[in-house]
Every structure is written in C-alpha cells, then in structure tokens.
Amino acid sequence: MNINPLGMPDTVKGAIAKAITHCDQYPDPTCAKLKQTLAQEFAVKRYDVSERDILLGNGASELFMAIVHAIRPRRAVIPAPSFSGYEYAMQAVDGEIAYCLLAEAEGFDPDFCQERLVAMLTAETDILFLANPNNPTGKLMSEVNVHHLLDHCREQGIFVVMDECFIDFCADAESALRWVKKYENLMVVQAFTKIYAIPGLRLGYLVCGNKSLREKIARNLPEWNVSVIAQEAGATAARARAYVTRTQKYVQRQRAFLEAALTDFGFRVCESSANFILFYTELPLYKMLLKKKILIRDCSNYEGLTQGYYRIAVKREEENRQLLKMIGECIENN
C-alpha cells in the first residue's frame, strides 16, 4: 500500500484514543473544527483559502463521486495511466472517457503530452481529471503547464479536478490550492489517507473557490459523512508539519536507493517524485514474488500500460532491502 512508511503520527493516535470517548455523540455535520484547522494551515503556506472553501469527505473517492454527480459530465479527459477512481466515478454517471496517453519514450512525463492534451480539451469536454503527482508514474507537472491547462480549460468552460492525494510526499511540489480563487472551474482534492497513514479512517477534503459549484457538490454528499474520530484525527494531523517534513526526507532517500537498485537489476525505471515507483521488466515478477509472500502492484490493467509494468511502494528501509533481496533471488532462479 502506498501509505507513509513512518506510520501514523503518535499525536494522531492520541487524538483517536481521546475521540473514542465522544463516539456516543453525533459528529459535527459542518466539520467546523477541522475546516478551521485546515484554513489556518493553509494561511501559514500563504494559500488564499477560507473555511467556507472547504468540503470534507469520507475519503477522496467520495469526493470524486460527489463531483461527477453534481456536474453530470458527459465527457471527461484523463491522462493515462492514471488512478482508476476517476473512471469509476465517470461510470456512475454513464459518462464518456477520452484518454490522453502518456508515452514511456517521454518518461511518462505529463509535460511532454501537453499539446496532445490541449488538443483534446474542446468544447465537447466537460471535465478534466489531473493527478499531481500522477499515480502510478509519480510524475509531477510543471507549474507553467498547470497554469496553461487551467487557462485553456477556463476558456473552454471545462471543469478541472486536481488530485493531490500524494503531493505531501513531494518536497518541492507546489499545490494548486494557490489558485482556487483565480480559477472558478478548479477543484483541488487531497486526502489524509496516504501521508498520515490512516486509510482505515477515510478522510479527504476538496477546496473550491466557486461558491455555486461548491454548494452543488455539497448537496451530493451524505449527511454525517465524517465521523467523530476522523474529524479529531484530521484536525490533529493537519498540524503535524514536522512529521510531513521528516516523511519527505525519508521517502526521498529510500526512493533514490530503490530506483538505483531496480536500475541495476536491468529494469526500466520511471523516475518518481512520490512514495512509489513504476518500473518495467519482462520477468513475471508479480507471480514470482507472490510465491515468496510479497505483494507488489501489477499495473497491466492500467489504461496505457501493458504486461510487465509494476509499482512498488517506498517502505521502511528494512522492508525495502528485503524486497530487493527477494527480487534478486527471483532473477537468479529465473
């Protein structure tokens, strides 16, 4: 799983334990405390985001679903490969999907497909799903190209969903949260799941500066959708700045170590900025490692990828070394 290898912060564990005593009460349906905390943290980063610009969801997936039910897009454009949750959401409203294929010859770099992507973003398109960084490639988009896409989509009347669920793992990444007031067609989605290692709690948020659009999305979210425990854990996690910085440094070191080792094995490695790595090998590595009770992600079912593409998560150093040892044994025994 692509969650933080450092595990859940101790402060969040404490908040969860404390919140259990309040589970005999209904959660705050407005998530006021959590929104206030997020807005305060955004202010520290100089993002012009207020509490009213924020919607909370039972994970990012619930927010993607609420977006498509609010907008009812007939056609979406999605760079491929990308997270399958966008496809799942579009299928719920019987929407058409057009894929802009990222090329391995270009390092799956989204900046290289900019012209192809813009050409697909015509008046017939209702919504564009972007991930920054991309999952499964781990690639970040350049700031200038994000701006260009946002400008073009605004001119064409196209909504943009910017999925930033892994952005906190990227030390040098700039969030599109800076631009939610400038672009009324922009929705930024982030999650607590990955960076704070709390996938079992289900907590994500959406930021949108367009009041009308935001209210329409809110009407497509269920009542009481964020539990007492999730709200308290989120409010505590949002303040854990030192933990995020420590995570970024740790992931950067371990990712470089893994990428170098995979390259030495002779695999084609997609250089990543996130906490996971995409690579290609002709070995049936998924099956070989499964026999050793190690599970990696077979990416052959991603749109735009074929048999032989795999993704691994950056984990604790001892786990990373164990994985590499097992891969080495697979190569020797092949």
What is the predicted role of each segment?
Residues 69-130:
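PLP-dependent aminotransferase-like
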Residues 251-252, 262-293:
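Conserved PLP-binding catalytic core of the aspartate aminotransferase-like
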